[in-house]
């Protein structure tokens, strides 16, 4: 008798739970910045699971190749959130394999820069998405769009808005919660942007030398100048002639600080620093981070750390 009562109660419970289980949504993000934004937009929503496609230590997706495991994750996705602007070079393959999978492009409406950060990017190609699987997969070409849009907090706000709209379109049953999360997050990002502008407006020196093309959007937004970029793509080896030219450029600029990134080695920076005396600092492009127990303020925390690093690096010590 007890067994029958237990089974009856269990059946009733499953009947009530089954709609919730059936409506569980899987949101897949392409890499870490989009993952951080998605976590904030879906916090507190029990019916949504966030899966990040690239491992949290991957960094930028310059040469990222989809694995069999990635394709299995995408096969279970209800929506795929991407950075866009050319970051996901594999996108055509995803769309061909999963033609019904909604893809939300966070870069929509953002004015893009070229890879060198000097000009606005003009898309003269007749396509809507990344040209995927090219032979020179992920490598730098002058005039290509710079995809590191999230390092301008105003751009981050636009990205969050685009992602929120896409999530609501894909899962309208969560609209109220997503809208509340959007409002809360945009308020925090707006405060971050104002703080960055106010703080960095005061630094007397504006030139920085970076080791990757991650920071042109940051520099444009906050009044800095990327005077030189050492490696257009992380891991590119410099020839002796290229190294000598960089040393000459940096000396001509009165040895501005060199900014490395924690995701990549600083061997070239150390060499240039020895030759010029230029100091070395670290800026984080927020492309890696913890996989579990991720603080919702992780993006803001790293951006404020970058702000403090720049404040120290670009403000002469008293007496200088």
Regions found by a protein language model. Give the residues of each.
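Positively charged n-region of N-terminal signal peptides that target proteins for export
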Residues: 1-5
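Extracytoplasmic entry segments of secretory-pathway proteins
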Residues: 6-9, 101
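Bacterial N-terminal signal peptides
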Residues: 8-19
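Extracytoplasmic metal-acquisition and chelation regions
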Residues: 24-320
